């Protein structure tokens, strides 16, 4: 550190004590919020962080027809009447995780349209892995300038083997979410094994999925014949 740079100096004290409440993980809650769109029912998420990305995802879910309520770090999502997979740029351009709605919209509605996703500027962060995976599952996708226009034909999404070029967390999550709307099992090779993937798998199991290998880098998911519509608290 240069002499002219600002610095924070921490001095030791005799004792540290007290209690703090840790905020829930944004990286876990956003994909679970996206996956809640798969379910024609209510999902309640506790210890949900009060941050801009969470509220942006809430706005996107409302655009899809969900009823969303947030009060004192508790998020209630009712996707019973959700009927739309076409998003505008009011919220989707504000955060990267908007792309996670591709899997749930294709799985439930068979249609997904979104302008280029936004988010923090951390170098180049293309959505190629997401698009390639959805195509392998059977979606027809076009787009320009980073946006996406996707639909599923009359045969629907079909479970398959997907090998990711890189263990992308977001692409892994999108594969898992989309696989819930596919016929048959899906295997994801070179998948991410980060904790936020584990959390998503826990939620998808509550919807009725059978999942193996989420901590190994190779995941197999078999969707239920009918997604659980009972209220879920997570």
Where are these regions (language model features)?
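Structural preference for solvent-exposed beta-strand-turn elements
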Residues: 1-234
């Amino acid at each position: 550190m240069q002499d002219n740079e600002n610095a924070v100096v921490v001095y030791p004290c005799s004792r540290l004590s007290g209690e703090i409440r840790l905020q829930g993980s944004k990286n876990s809650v956003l994909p679970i919020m996206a996956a809640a769109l798969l379910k024609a029912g209510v999902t309640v998420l506790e210890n949900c962080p009060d941050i801009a990305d969470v509220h942006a995802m809430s706005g996107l879910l409302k655009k899809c027809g969900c009823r969303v309520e947030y009060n004192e770090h508790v998020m209630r999502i009712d996707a019973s009447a959700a009927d739309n997979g076409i998003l505008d740029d009011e919220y989707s351009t504000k955060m990267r995780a908007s792309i996670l709605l591709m899997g749930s919209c294709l799985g439930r509605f068979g249609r997904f349209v979104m302008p280029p996703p936004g988010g923090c500027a951390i170098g180049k962060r293309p959505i190629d892995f997401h698009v390639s995976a959805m195509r392998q599952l059977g979606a027809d996708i076009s787009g320009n300038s980073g946006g996406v226009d996707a639909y599923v034909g009359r045969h629907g999404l079909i479970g398959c083997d997907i090998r990711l070029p890189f263990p992308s967390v977001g692409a892994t999550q999108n594969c898992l979410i989309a696989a819930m709307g596919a016929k048959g099992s899906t295997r994801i090779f070179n998948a991410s094994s980060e904790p936020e993937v584990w959390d998503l798998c826990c939620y998808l199991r509550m919807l009725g999925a059978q999942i193996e290998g989420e901590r190994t880098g190779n995941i197999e998911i078999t969707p239920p014949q009918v997604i659980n519509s009972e209220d879920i608290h997570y």
